[in-house]
């Protein structure tokens, strides 16, 4: 397989794989979409309170039965383990109801060649793993949108990402940079656990 066999027609907004042995993995957005569809189906059947957790994607339906908000955490990418548990360290905790919290990062899905770690989030400009961030998290009413946004934000500059997030109603983001800085969008703190 060769990246040159990926034919992108921006005008027609199409993608074509000219090599029949190639396939496209939609995992970067498919999981968020599936979580959102599951949440919407559950709500349509009358479910009023739930927290759906699917590998880095959290989707809150309503509030907890006691009326309090659900809690979610953004795992510390610099001290991450292979499996997120209650004892994992985090850089931000959020309260949420009828919201999704999705994180994309470079610390769980990667491989090492000659001592160099290569993660799975590819910068479309360089065709190499993106180097802007160690993780990006998004809060959004829609898990599918949040999943798309985390992947996209991971592959763009902080300035461009901040402009994008600030242009979207009801959407917030948190960026963890390779130098250990945690940067929040203007409304992230409104959701942060006190």
Protein language model features and the residues they cover:
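Mature catalytic core of soluble alpha/beta enzymes
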Residues: 1-194
């Amino acid at each position: 397989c060769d990246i040159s066999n990926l034919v992108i027609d921006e005008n027609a907004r199409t993608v074509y794989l000219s090599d029949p042995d190639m396939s496209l993995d939609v995992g970067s957005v498919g999981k968020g979409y599936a979580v959102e569809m599951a949440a919407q189906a559950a709500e349509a059947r009358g479910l009023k309170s739930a927290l759906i957790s699917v590998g880095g994607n959290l989707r809150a339906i309503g509030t907890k039965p006691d009326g309090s908000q659900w809690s979610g955490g953004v795992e510390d990418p610099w001290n991450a383990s292979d499996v997120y548990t209650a004892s994992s360290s985090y850089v931000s905790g959020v309260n949420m109801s009828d919201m999704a919290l999705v994180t994309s990062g470079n610390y769980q899905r990667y491989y090492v060649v000659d001592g160099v770690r290569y993660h799975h989030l590819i910068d479309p400009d360089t065709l190499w793993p993106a180097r802007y961030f160690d993780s990006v998290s998004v809060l959004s009413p829609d898990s599918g949108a949040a999943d798309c946004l985390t992947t996209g934000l991971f592959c763009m500059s902080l300035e461009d990402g901040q402009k994008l997030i600030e242009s979207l109603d009801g959407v917030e983001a948190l960026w963890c940079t390779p130098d250990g800085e945690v940067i929040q969008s203007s409304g992230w703190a409104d959701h942060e656990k006190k």
